[in-house]
Amino acid sequence: MLSVAGAVAAAVLVLPPRAVADQVPQVGTPGAAATPGPQASEPEHSCASDDPALFWRCAQEKATAFEAPRTADGRPDFSGYWRHGTEAKEDLEAPWDNRARVGAGRERERDAGPGKSLIVDPPDGKLPLQPWAEVQKRENEARYIDQNTHCFLSGVPRFMYEAGAYQILQAPESITILSEEAHAFRVIATDGRPRIAKNLRLWLGDARGRWEGNTLVVETTNQNGRVFLDRRGTFYTDAATVTERFTMLDQNTIAYGATVDDPLVYTRPFTIGFMLTRHTTKGFEILEDSCFEGNKDAEILYSIGLKKYPGITSEDVPALKVRTPTSR
């Protein structure tokens, strides 16, 4: 039987099988079964920086400088295959540093060390958690299994920094984003249709998009509050609103930002920012994701006493603010 410390370590380090696809940093290789085709030389990307804060500052300055290609209805054309270069799913405040990932395998990943915070606001790169939420975050990491171990959906914004690649499809009335992670997809309505009923709570919420010049602004509500934003137990409730901004900086670069606003958990909204880059591998395509096949992680984690995360609703918060950390 593992000690409590061992259980916590297991919760941090045990990854679902599909995460292996993201462990070998080969451009255009979305999964173990994929065989990459010939790859063009990597193009330069506007505002490219290892520091998310510097990238985000530059992206704001250049947001209107590029004349993006247009769709038939005159909107910026984001269609194509895209990827990110962040390990924020591990820890928003200190993601693993991709620059140090020179070899394949989990041992090399563990050696990589922390990178710079993906949080670009507040400027200190820290989560503005309320005191009770700091306690809850530590308890989440120690007691609960990340939703991805069960192949559950990741929620927004984590959907945008999970393993694998993305495909963006545009139509006049909507934008669809397909993810290799768990066969997930989002359909973002841009035609002004009304929102779904407030009592409907979904893993990826209810998204509505609008255009502000060349920037696609997406506001997502109605999430179910059952996801972690990273594998360190960062969370929000079902009352959260997430506002994303997609801005094309050049033909091969999108500046992506997401502001999380949940006044039940945080003292103020916070914003993450990073770069999406276009896949340039010839013949690249989204492949089927092997998620649960052969997955022993959940069995192991349950055997050492960890639990499935129950989520936190707005109705739960008053009691959680006054309870002791182990009373759930």
Language-model segments: which ranges?
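Bacterial N-terminal signal peptides that target proteins for export
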Residues: 1-7
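PEST-like low-complexity, intrinsically disordered acidic/proline/serine-rich tracts
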Residues: 6, 12-328
